[in-house]
């Protein structure tokens, strides 16, 4: 069998067990409380493999002594979408954060980029005009002005632009996989 590092008491630990069992692979879990402990144990050779969310694997790989000696395998053993979180009790801030992400996703869906966002104010599509603040009062519900979405798009781009710049171009996760729009087979 193999030894496999993971975090104790997490869905990752359960997903690892289910995956290995479904493949008939004998393994010995080596579980730790903290992510840094898991990485240190794996990097020290205490485990043959290490599992967590793909984005976590990619990020933690950069902390290893010799990152180029390790690869993130292409297999996906579970799908657990990750997203922005906020503390409980501030529903307005929660809405702003949620709608900021939605803005980036919708902008990509409509072909709005950081480069063309201003020109979209004159679009024939009323949904696009609302998204860039040329129509409606979308920001009022959050206590924001009507161009808050436009500023998000101009400053960070649509979801695809942001993913490419911050994740794909860095080599962390070059393939968007489930981070594609639903129209391209993803979950967005």
What are these regions (language model features)?
Residues 10, 56-57, 74-147, 158-160:
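Extended ligand-binding regions for polar small-molecule ligands
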Residues 28, 69-71:
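Conserved beta-strand segments of alpha/beta enzyme cores
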Residues 39-41, 56-66:
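Pocket-flanking alpha-helical
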Residues 17-22, 43-47, 62, 101-109:
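Sec-exported extracytoplasmic/periplasmic mature domains
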Residues 134-188:
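C-terminal functional modules
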Residues 1-38, 55:
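Bilobed "Venus flytrap"/periplasmic-binding protein-like clamshell domains
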Residues 2, 43-52:
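Alpha-to-beta junction loops
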Residues 3-7, 50, 85:
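Short, well-ordered beta-strand segments
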